Design a protein with these regions (language model features):
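Structured catalytic-domain cores with a bias toward divalent-metal coordination
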Residues: 1-141
Length: 141
């Protein structure tokens, strides 16, 4: 708790309450795309995880024109099984859909905007649209 008290307190709250879905949102300086990175390389990953992830990415793709699934991190990236990363730890510990959502720092190569590039308005829209995908995965029935 001394080094990162905010991480410790959030982790403790998660352990007490449980987690239905975990989304760690980042900006990627190298890849000019909006994408998610899942937990498919973890030993605890199952076909049920894959189905939830597919439902999420399908719904997110319908909701937001910036989101895509063709470009992202390679499957052999060394962080794919690193349980020190929040999304990997949460996915392994809680068995929930757990993803890192990456967005570009400058612009989306698939849908460039020469006037503004990637900006706050696009980030806000992405945040609103991700709620539709979350609802699709978590809604009963």
């Amino acid at each position: 708790p001394e080094r990162s008290p905010e991480v410790w307190f959030v982790r403790e709250a998660m352990l007490q309450s449980g987690v239905a879905l975990f989304l760690d949102v980042h900006g990627d300086e190298g890849l000019p795309y909006v994408f998610v990175d899942g937990c498919e390389m973890l030993p605890s990953y199952t076909s049920a995880h894959a189905q939830r992830e597919r439902a999420f990415t399908d719904a997110f793709g319908r909701a937001n024109p910036d989101f895509q699934t063709q470009h992202g991190y390679s499957r052999d990236k060394d962080t794919k099984v690193n349980l020190a990363l929040a999304s990997k730890w949460a996915g392994d510990r809680f068995g929930c859909l757990s993803l890192t959502l990456e967005m570009p720092f400058k612009d989306n190569a698939n849908l460039p905007d020469p006037q503004t590039g990637w900006n706050g308005a696009r980030s806000r829209r992405l945040g609103g649209d991700v709620l539709q995908a979350i609802h699709t995965v978590l809604a009963p029935g």
